[in-house]
């Protein structure tokens, strides 16, 4: 489904009162809500344990260093429905900058409404416009639902184990 409003990845404007849910960059003021979303994600993984201090510190590092990564949120008015964080690195295989996409999480009350697809579409558009060469993500091995979602978004399995989407 096509998102009703798609704001610019570089926009720092917050949603207007009558705006439908849309994607925009997170701000430092969003840190408490982002921390809650990441802690929820960590609590559902066998590989991680939620730790408010660690999650908040990691999110703050990304927010304070936009040259190293970005966090985007699905926002409606003053409520955050979901988030994704992107970390930037260089790939010698692709000969350019690539993205490691992490913490794709939608609040439990808002799952199944297209917000995950809205976020990933936004990330792909951002990556293309900024000339990134690939988006790589790690998804839980045991979560067939998560893997199917990302396959529908154009990601594929690689021989290196993570899933990825090549950006042309």
Task: List each language-model region with its residue ranges.
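A short beta-loop-alpha structural element at the N-terminal edge
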Residues: 22-34
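Conserved GNAT-fold acetyl-CoA-binding loop/helix
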Residues: 36-61
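A short helix-loop-beta-strand connector motif used in the catalytic cores of GNAT acetyltransferases and
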Residues: 61-73, 100
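Conserved beta-strand in the GNAT
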Residues: 73, 79-88, 105
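A conserved beta-turn-beta hairpin within the catalytic core of GNAT-like acetyltransferases
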Residues: 79, 90-101, 111, 158-159
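Conserved acetyl-CoA-binding loop-helix of GNAT-fold acetyltransferases
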Residues: 106, 112-125, 152
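Conserved active-site alpha-helix within GNAT-family acetyltransferase domains
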Residues: 117, 129, 141-159
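Conserved GNAT acetyl-CoA-binding A-motif
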Residues: 120, 127-139
């Amino acid at each position: 489904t096509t998102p009703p409003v798609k704001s610019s990845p570089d926009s720092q404007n917050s949603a207007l009162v009558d705006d439908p849910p849309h994607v925009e960059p997170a701000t430092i003021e969003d840190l408490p809500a982002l921390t809650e979303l990441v802690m929820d994600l960590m609590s559902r993984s066998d590989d991680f344990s939620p730790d408010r201090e660690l999650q908040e510190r990691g999110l703050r590092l990304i927010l304070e260093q936009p040259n190293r990564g970005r966090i985007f949120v699905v926002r409606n008015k003053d409520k955050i429905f979901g988030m994704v964080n992107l970390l930037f690195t260089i790939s010698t295989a692709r000969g350019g900058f690539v993205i490691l996409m992490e913490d794709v999480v939608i609040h439990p009350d808002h799952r199944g409404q297209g917000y995950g697809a809205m976020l990933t579409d936004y990330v792909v558009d951002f990556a293309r416009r900024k000339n990134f060469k690939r988006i790589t993500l790690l998804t839980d091995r045991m979560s067939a639902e998560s893997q199917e979602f990302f396959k529908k978004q154009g990601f594929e399995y690689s021989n290196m184990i993570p899933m990825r989407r090549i950006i042309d």
